[in-house]
Design a protein with these regions (language model features):
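N-terminal helical cap/lid subdomain that shapes the substrate entry/recognition surface
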Residues: 1-77, 99
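Phosphate- and divalent-cation-binding pockets in alpha/beta enzyme and binding domains
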Residues: 46, 100-104, 162, 199
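Short, structured coil segments at secondary-structure junctions
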Residues: 51, 86, 113-114, 166-168, ...
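Short hydrophobic/aromatic-enriched beta-strand-loop microsegments
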Residues: 56, 112-120, 167-174
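Substrate-recognition element of Asp-dependent hydrolases with the DxDx(T/V) motif
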Residues: 57-64, 68-71, 79-108, 118-121
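Substrate-recognition "cap/lid" segment bordering the active-site pocket of phosphatases
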Residues: 91, 97-151
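Short acidic-hydrophobic, aromatic-tinged amphipathic segments that line or gate anion-handling sites
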Residues: 119, 187-199
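Acidic, Mg2+-coordinating phosphoryl-transfer loop and its flanking beta/alpha structural elements
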Residues: 147-190
Length: 206
């Protein structure tokens, strides 16, 4: 949700100041995170470019703070039951650490549901987000499925671009207004997870 995204921005800013020792106040650091997303599609990238911090160090410090947010996530009522009605195998691919992602999946009651789970760092040694489409190709190879037979779903449009580059179908979930109407690498956009599930059935026959 937008509220959770705001918390992630603040966690990124706090990590930059408290763990990496950057000479910034909290407001300035948070502003830089938002600027980084807008410019590089990655909230950490600006700190790598302006302060020379390795992406691995940025990744680790950010996830140290992200751990504190897991308990604040509110599970969607009946989401597991809704996902079980989709007639196709479903996988998780995340740029978050395996530890945090699995904590989140357990917290929201979906840990045992997905057919497989893949993590950009632990499985593919990729610390920097949105650098190439290679990691998406590797996920398709792992599940032995052609990209054109996959649908990649995300609420972050920046993750959808590279998925589309290798031929995957792409769906964006948004929460308030669809701000990506003119982005050609997004096939469909649905408001919220429930509308997305309904759309998968209606528009894709899942």
């Amino acid at each position: 949700t937008d509220e959770y995204k705001h918390k992630l921005d603040e966690a990124t800013a706090a990590a930059a100041i408290n763990e990496l020792g950057l000479p910034l106040d909290f407001q300035t650091a948070t502003k830089k995170v938002k600027e980084s997303y807008a410019t590089y599609r990655d909230g950490l990238e600006i700190f790598a470019r302006e302060y020379g911090i390795p992406h691995k160090d940025l990744y680790i410090s950010y996830h140290n703070y992200k751990k504190k947010l897991v308990s604040t996530i509110k599970p969607y009522d009946g989401l597991l039951e809704k996902l079980q009605t989709i007639n196709c195998p479903q996988y998780v691919f995340s740029t978050s650490s395996k530890d945090i992602c699995e904590q989140i999946l357990k917290h929201i009651g979906l840990y045992d549901f997905f057919k497989g789970r893949f993590y950009s760092v632990e499985d593919f040694n990729v610390y920097k987000k949105n650098e190439s489409s290679e990691v998406y190709q590797k996920v398709c190879e792992q599940i032995n499925t052609k990209p054109e037979d996959c649908i990649f779903i995300d609420d972050s449009y920046s993750n959808l671009d590279f998925a589309k580059q290798i031929g995957m179908g792409t769906i964006r979930i948004y929460y308030k207004n669809n701000s990506t109407k003119d982005m050609k690498f997004i096939d469909k956009a649905y408001k919220g997870i429930y509308e997305c599930i309904d759309g998968l059935k209606k528009d894709y026959g899942c």
